[in-house]
Design a protein with these regions (language model features):
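Acyl-donor-binding surface of acyltransferase catalytic domains
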Residues: 60-63, 73-145, 287-292
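Short glycine/proline-centered loop/turn elements that form peptide/ligand docking sites
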Residues: 244, 267-271, 288-292
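Conserved acetyl-CoA-binding loop-helix of GNAT-fold acetyltransferases
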Residues: 76-90, 230, 236-249, 253, ...
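Conserved hydrophobic beta-strand within the GNAT/NAT acetyltransferase core sheet
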Residues: 100-103, 225, 259-263
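Short amphipathic alpha-helix that is part of the acyltransferase structural core
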Residues: 1-27, 141-178
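Conserved active-site tyrosine of GNAT-family acetyltransferases
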Residues: 111-115, 271, 275-276, 280
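Phosphate-binding active sites in nucleotide-utilizing proteins
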Residues: 171-216, 228
Length: 292
């Protein structure tokens, strides 16, 4: 089924935006497995004799009482509306009290119109940014802090990572804290399944920020920065840039030809300015909708 899912998803993505990054096997498995709790997935078609036309992945997050919904449809297929109806029915059956967040490419006007007709409103905008590697990378000043790789097989490092991560994102839109046990299970899973690496920056021996990246986009010969954050008390001191430049350096040394990440367009921490400063450029825009 992963092959079918990727075929549907990439035909959808690239028809809407040929510059977008095609989905790879790791992402396909994530959509089937689930981001947090087990996913609810369906392939849909109008007639028995048809090929599969749409893929629905409904990802529950029980700790946040929230669903994340993605629907991919082959260009020209007429399965989008019935697939959305099916997803809404599955969500209600699972838990009618959950909020529903849906991701849509910014130029998928048919899907956006369908959502708005169902009473959904746009909640947030996100950009995917990418840069070419290798680049002439400015080295960060040692006075900014010391960067070391976290050993995700050690509980002490996991607890340090958890503390820094939760504090760094505590003021971000939609953030809700996760307890260590639940959070660490997700991190260990991502280490094993996506080859995630995490790096910590400390100032005078005090943990201050982190960056993590993985092989999710390896099929595109690209590294993927899945997380970058600086604790509230250390923001505005250049630590985020030092961490990002470290990620650029490591991915260049790994032989990747590109590096990409996603950013909340409404992020007030100056993240977008930082990414553009190091040479990243937007290649796609996504809109997140919410049911009211």
């Amino acid at each position: 089924d992963i092959v079918k899912i990727l075929d549907i998803a990439n035909s959808n993505l690239l028809a809407l935006n040929p510059s977008d990054i095609p989905m790879g096997e790791i992402e396909g498995h994530e959509f089937v497995r689930g981001f947090f709790d087990p996913a609810i997935t369906r392939l849909t078609k109008l007639h028995e004799e048809d090929d599969w036309q749409s893929f629905v992945t409904l990802n529950p997050d029980s700790s946040r009482k929230r669903f994340y919904l993605d629907i991919y449809t082959r260009p020209g297929a007429r399965t989008l509306a019935p697939s959305l109806d099916l997803a809404l029915e599955l969500a209600r059956k699972h838990d009618p009290g959950y909020r529903l967040w849906l991701g849509v490419q910014s130029n998928d006007f048919a899907y956006k119109s369908l959502l708005e007709n169902h009473g959904f409103t746009i909640l947030r905008k996100y950009w995917t940014l990418e840069m070419k590697l290798p680049v002439e990378n400015e080295s960060s000043s040692p006075s900014l802090g010391v960067i070391r790789e976290l050993d995700l097989d050690k509980e002490d490092d996991l607890r340090t990572f958890h503390e820094v991560h939760q504090d760094a994102f505590s003021q971000h839109f939609g953030f809700m804290p996760r307890q260590f046990n639940e959070w660490s299970e997700i991190v260990i899973r991502d280490k094993d399944e996506t080859n995630m690496q995490a790096w910590l920056i400390s100032v005078n021996g005090v943990p201050a920020g982190f960056v993590d990246f993985n092989d999710e986009q390896l099929h595109n010969d690209s590294g993927y920065v899945s997380g970058l954050g600086v604790m509230q008390a250390f923001q505005g001191k250049g630590l985020g840039e030092a961490l990002l430049r470290h990620a650029i350096q490591i991915n260049s040394e790994l032989g990747r030809s590109k590096l990409c990440l996603s950013v909340d367009a409404g992020n007030e921490s100056g993240a977008l300015r930082l990414y553009e400063k190091v040479g990243m450029k937007p290649i796609s825009e996504w809109h997140q909708y919410e049911d009211l």
